[in-house]
Design a protein with these regions (language model features):
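Short, well-formed alpha-helical segments that are part of the catalytic scaffolds
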Residues: 15-30
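Acidic donor-binding segment of Leloir-type glycosyltransferases
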Residues: 26-71
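Acidic donor-binding/catalytic loop of UDP-sugar-dependent glycosyltransferases
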Residues: 49, 98-113, 389-393
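Glycine-rich, basic loop-to-helix element that forms the pyrophosphate-binding segment
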Residues: 71-88
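Short aromatic/hydrophobic "clamp" motif used to bind/position activated sugar donors
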Residues: 93
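Conserved donor NDP-sugar-binding/catalytic core segment of glycosyltransferases
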Residues: 105-163
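A recurrent flexible, glycine/aromatic-enriched loop bordering the glycosyltransferase active site
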Residues: 157-170, 176-195
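Catalytic core of nucleotide-sugar-dependent glycosyltransferases
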Residues: 250-276
Length: 493
């Protein structure tokens, strides 16, 4: 391996004690021949004496940079990290938060991993990130005598303690730590411990500084790394420990995260960013895998598409109409619609090319940017019956907001074919588990499905026409018109 320089960028704000411990562990790195490191600390206006602590470390590192920036209304993690990026001179950039500890071989492992594959981005396994010492049991960490040489072993033990492990652990194991197998590897990005090749960082650009407060800036950064063809890897050997500290301003952080999630969707306006607004948790990939594989026209056959097309004649009147859930250009053309939402990328490409006079967007329809009452009619097909009921509710509510009338066009005479459950060879016994409900009661079921890179996927729901119509009657002030496969020309409220 040729010489490699690894730059650590550490943003900090009033965490002098945590920063000191983190720098102590970095100072204990045992560097192999040809590996060098620099440490860049960016102080975002601390008032707790951080500068005095940092001055003590200038002589402990061969390359050390400390920059202080006065706090103002635009202070944020993104701006602080971007300032660090401009100061860094390494071939590899490692982003660490204050109080994140790494073992003595961390730098060597990072250098070796990225030498193997220059486009690789490392998501470092991290323990303790969600632990709050004011609420959680700290005895698992208190029992440990933590040192730079035993940190990986400590992380391994702590990861076995409920609440202490990395929440990405399950999806990483399911994909043999190759997160590029996922539909949305960027959704798991956390810059509290992430390594990026400097050249790839330059291609992707720095952090989006419109993300003020807390949340989403690292996910958006990882999204652009994904667009720059990064290969994402969950790194276990070069692991990290987040020293637990009190979670301050919880409500403020929650509001900030919600605002930043909305900004993320405004910036991209695609199905994944839309799902982040509608579904809390790290299971976006399970839902996206289903949406990417879904082709209602193929599943239900030619007769289904004919029934849909016959229903289109009722709205081909030139009025502003939005279609949701039609993935065939020929079928969609029968509606004369002005707008159409495509729920997966493959359909989006076909529909956009096949309908040049129609405005096609890559969206589910649960969180759109249309004004209230923008459409004369929104037509929703059997597609809504395949979604989890919580997402179906979101689609109906949004349709009621943006349209003067909503039509449920149900042309499927039977339920769709279920994917055959074929567990991987290593699985001797198939057990279906349902994770604990999220805060809003949303829960997901998973099943093993065949595929080279696919381990889990949200199952296919099939709500009856009556169930969806009942939801519409409850959620929409004027109800919805429903057309069924058995009686496709008779409309009923």
């Amino acid at each position: 391996m040729s010489s490699v320089k690894v730059s650590y960028i550490i943003p900090t704000y009033n965490f002098k004690d945590l920063l000191k411990t983190g720098l102590d562990f970095l100072a204990a790195q045992r560097l192999d021949a040809g590996v060098e490191m620099e440490v860049v600390v960016i102080d975002d206006g601390s008032s707790d004496g951080t500068h005095q602590i940092v001055n003590d470390y200038a002589e402990r590192f061969a390359h050390f940079v400390y920059v202080y920036r006065a706090r103002d209304e635009r202070s944020c993690r993104s701006r602080t990290r971007n300032l660090g990026i401009r100061q860094a001179s390494g071939d590899v950039v490692v982003f660490l938060d204050s109080g994140v500890l790494v073992g003595e071989q961390f730098t060597n492992i990072v250098a070796a991993r990225l030498a193997e594959l220059p486009s690789r981005v490392l998501y470092h396994r991290i323990a303790g990130l969600e632990v709050d010492p004011q609420q959680d049991d700290m005895s698992p960490l208190q029992r440990e005598r933590l040192t730079p040489d035993n940190l990986p072993a400590v992380v391994e033990r702590l990861s076995a303690v409920p609440g202490w492990g990395d929440e990405r652990e399950g999806v990483a194991r399911a994909n043999a730590d190759d997160l590029s197998r996922l539909v949305l590897p960027w959704a798991y990005g956390m810059t509290c411990a992430m390594s990026v090749p400097a050249e790839l960082l330059r291609q992707a650009g720095g952090f989006e500084e419109r993300f003020l407060g807390w949340g989403c800036e690292d996910v958006e950064f990882a999204l652009r790394l994904h667009q720059a063809k990064a290969v994402f890897h969950f790194e276990r050997e070069a692991c990290a420990l987040h020293l637990p500290h009190p979670k301050a301003h919880t409500k403020k952080h929650s509001r900030s995260h919600a605002d930043n999630a909305i900004l993320l969707h405004k910036l991209y306006g695609i199905v994944p960013t839309e799902l982040m607004l509608m579904y809390p948790g790290l299971f976006f990939d399970a839902i996206m895998l289903k949406l990417q594989s879904l082709q209602t026209g193929v599943w239900f056959g030619a007769a289904y598409k004919q029934r849909l097309a016959s229903g289109g004649a009722f709205w081909a009147d030139g009025a502003r109409t939005l279609l949701i859930g039609i993935d065939d250009p020929d079928c969609a053309r029968c509606f004369g619609a002005t707008h159409l939402l495509a729920y997966n990328e493959e359909s989006f490409g076909h529909l956009r090319n096949g309908l040049p006079d129609c405005s096609v967007s890559y969206s589910l329809g649960g969180r759109t940017f249309f004004a209230d009452g923008y459409f004369a009619t929104v037509v929703i097909t059997d597609f809504i019956r395949l979604l989890h009921p919580a997402l179906a509710v979101q689609l109906l509510r949004e349709a009621g907001r943006i349209a003067k009338s909503v039509v449920l066009l149900f042309a499927a005479a039977a339920s769709p074919p279920q994917p055959k459950v074929v567990p991987p060879a290593i699985v001797k016994r198939l057990i279906t588990l349902e994770p604990a409900p999220a805060e809003d009661g949303f829960s997901i079921e998973y099943a093993f499905v065949p595929g080279n890179h696919r381990a889990v996927m949200e199952r296919y729901y099939w709500s009856s026409a009556e169930e969806i119509a009942e939801l519409a009657a409850r959620l929409l002030p004027a109800g919805a018109w429903t057309l069924s496969a058995s009686d496709p020309v008779e409309a009923q409220v």
